[in-house]
């Protein structure tokens, strides 16, 4: 039974990685039965954060999001055991989710390439003037990812957003978030080895909720149309 479970988990990870390859359009996400979400994975070794439109990740995403690696910001390994879900952002529609994902990736590229010196100047330093670290772990990267998520939601005014965190302290102070746009909650407790199962369950739940909301909106629109027609008859 245990061997069967492990084989099943391995299959899901492989399939998930294949699905994660390439940037997704709205139709791609619908065809894959994905919800309007963005998944943020934290590297346990380095503190770096990886963004994904689906509940999995691919080497192509790592290559795209870490374009200028150096000794302080090395290109991370794709090893599944090094990545843990930090948060899952649920958006009101696919347009919002795609805008948020692209915004997060672009902000990372600006910080690492276009404004590299400016970004480093803002980071906490050690006595030698390097980005502060403990071992190989640099907390500044996850802090920047959280700040970027807040900025993207604010800048694009992505109302109806909800974010589920591994721990609420990750989001920082409430003053950094617009309460009229986003709500916060915690992820259900889970065993790290069952992460793929949890994320797939969150995906399925979000797909169902999105379908229900869309159906309600269509029914409301039809009702309004019927009332308008009866008034003009």
UniProtKB/Swiss-Prot annotation:
Q: Write out the annotated subcellular location.
A: Nucleus; Mitochondrion
Alphabetically sorted, this entry's keywords are:
Mitochondrion, Nucleus, Ribonucleoprotein, Ribosomal protein, Transcription, Transcription regulation
| InterPro entries from the UniProt entry | Ribosomal_mL67
Q: GO molecular function, one example?
A: structural constituent of ribosome
Please, one GO biological process term?
A: mitochondrial genome maintenance
Annotated Gene Ontology cellular component terms = mitochondrion; nucleus; ribonucleoprotein complex; ribosome
Query: Its domain of life?
Result: Eukaryota
Biased-composition ranges, Low complexity, are: 215-233
Chain positions covered by the region annotation Disordered: 214-233
Q: Which family does it belong to?
A: Belongs to the mitochondrion-specific ribosomal protein mL67 family.
What this chain does, per the entry, is described as:
Transcription factor involved in regulation of RNA polymerase II-dependent transcription. Also involved in regulation of mitochondrial DNA recombination, maintenance and repair, and generation of homoplasmic cells.
Per its record, how is this protein called by name?
A: Large ribosomal subunit protein mL67
The organism encoding this protein is Debaryomyces hansenii (strain ATCC 36239 / CBS 767 / BCRC 21394 / JCM 1990 / NBRC 0083 / IGC 2968) (Yeast)
Its gene is MHR1
